[in-house]
Amino acid sequence: MKYDSNGALLATSIPGLPEPHRGKVRDIYDLGDSLLFVATDRISAFDCVMPNGIPDKGKVLTQMSLFWFELLSWMPNHLLCWDAAQFPASLKAVAGDLAGRSLIVKKARTIPLECIVRGYLIGSGWKDYRKNGRVCGIPLPAGYQQAQKLEEPLFTPSTKADSGHDENIS
């Protein structure tokens, strides 16, 4: 495991397993019939991974996911196990590092989609608006200021890129 000077987990390495697929924030290990998702403390903003992390950010992301899995428990999903104490024996040596930030999930076909709901005109939305008065192809009234609250939330899905830029879907 690789931690920064503030104790943020930046990268994982699990003895006996091949190197993971590394996304911008998560490391994904192939366990055969399932996958291990590890939410690191890496920070990704504007399609860039920052050199330092935020300690326990991965734990917060995982707890948010578990909240939604519980709220929508009536709907079938891919979650198999979230409790590191119940993970396979091959993961016991790193159970302390994985606790609270890891999920074992069913393998499934990935749909590379990011669902974004925008409440404020900031970031790439502001950049688009300044250029053409639209956000992801959605026209907005003139006169908005940077970081201003939008009258109604905007749903602006994009493709999900492992590296490089996500592309807006219009």
What does each model-found stretch correspond to?
Residues 2-161:
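Active-site loop/lid in soluble adenylation, ligation, and acyl-transfer enzymes
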